[in-house]
């Protein structure tokens, strides 16, 4: 991921909050999609998880605790999750699935094919819960493939395509926060595409 926290610049309290959101997202990915889904955990979706949980704090029940996991088998770690965390868990798996499918189609990468096969059922479940978002992922990747096939050098159009995808994903509920979330997602998506 590209949205990485500056841990040195975070207070101990902020570091703890970030880590609990990261671990909460990992835990929910595992609960919804199993251990294989945990490989889709990313800093980018952790950022979205923190953003959405902060915006909707108090509107949805939050859960927290201390648990051990495969990465931390000895000492338990603090985790925190809420409804937006499940949303981010589904998006994480779906994004990795469609990205792996894209790599298979472009490069015939066997690892990508294997990984996408592992995520087939999980992505189908995520697509049932979030059809608008999963359709946007598919449409964006198809449009990006068209740009690549045409040899497009229009960075604004190409990055704007990925920005539009991120705007759709950031717009969790299509509610009062939609304009701000879409703007953040769009501009962040353009930036991420240009970095990549």
Name the predicted role of every residue range.
Residues 189-195:
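Glycine/small-residue-rich hydrophobic helix-like segments
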Residues 184-188:
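Membrane-embedded alpha-helical segments that form the functional core of polytopic membrane enzymes
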Residues 1-183, 194:
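Acidic catalytic motifs of isoprenoid enzymes
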């Amino acid at each position: 991921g590209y949205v990485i926290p500056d841990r040195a610049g975070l207070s101990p309290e902020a570091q703890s909050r970030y880590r609990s959101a990261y671990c909460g997202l990992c835990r929910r990915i595992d609960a919804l999609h199993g251990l294989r889904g945990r490989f889709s955990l990313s800093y980018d979706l952790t950022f979205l998880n923190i953003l959405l949980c902060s915006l909707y704090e108090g509107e949805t029940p939050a859960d927290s605790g201390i648990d051990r996991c495969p990465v931390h088998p000895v000492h338990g770690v603090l985790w925190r999750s809420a409804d937006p965390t499940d949303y981010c868990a589904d998006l994480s798996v779906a994004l990795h699935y469609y990205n792996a499918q894209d790599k298979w189609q472009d490069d015939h990468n066997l690892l990508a094919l294997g990984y996408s096969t592992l995520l087939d059922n999980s992505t189908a479940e995520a697509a049932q819960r979030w059809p608008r978002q999963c359709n946007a992922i598919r449409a964006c990747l198809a449009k990006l493939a068209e740009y690549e096939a045409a040899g497009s050098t229009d960075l604004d159009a190409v990055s704007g395509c990925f920005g539009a995808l991120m705007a759709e994903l950031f717009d969790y509920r299509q509610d009062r926060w939609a304009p701000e979330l879409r703007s953040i997602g769009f501009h962040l998506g353009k930036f991420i595409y240009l970095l990549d």
